[in-house]
Amino acid sequence: MNVQIREIFLDDLASLWEVAYRNPNAEWTKWNGPYFKDVLPTRREFLEKVGPTDFVHNQFKNIIIVDKQIVGMVSAYYEDGELKRWLDVGIVIYSTENWQKGIGKKALKLWIDYIFSIVSLPHVGLTTWSGNLRMIRLAKRLDLEKEAQIKKVRFWQGKYWDSIKYGILRED
């Protein structure tokens, strides 16, 4: 299995929308910060506005390719906004058929290495929630250090969950 990450091009948007956003009730939406209740873009919104503006040629968003097919996305964002000193990464593998196959581990490792190559920051973080056991296992498998656990700050399905922060230093 050949796992790659790469920049998103305009030609990728239709395929990316099909894989990621076609089904608004896709299983991945239940694990990727579901407490935010984000609304997925329509095909038209994604192809005409959101995709070209926020995804195409964005150094902080790459697609994950396995055997020439889009299977997910990696991303990064500044926790501290315009200060740009605190960067977190994220990953989504869209289809459950591609879960538990090591794709996430390979892709996130490539992504963290890439992020360290384009920014001069000493630290990269990853934030998840206590209900997302797969993401917690992934962080541990990549030797990210658990740096914080903020108790009961994420409310989902009638229950409070913890926010969990992991990180890695450049020299690690």
Language-model features: locations:
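Acyl-donor (CoA/ACP) binding surface of acyl/acetyltransferases
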Residues: 1-15, 19, 61-172
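Short loop/turn motifs at secondary-structure junctions and domain boundaries
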Residues: 52-57, 144
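A generic secondary-structure signal
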Residues: 49-52, 114
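An amphipathic alpha-helix signature
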Residues: 13-21, 43-48
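Conserved GNAT-fold acetyl-CoA-binding loop/helix
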Residues: 25-49
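A general structural signal marking secondary-structure boundaries and capping sites
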Residues: 24, 53-54, 119
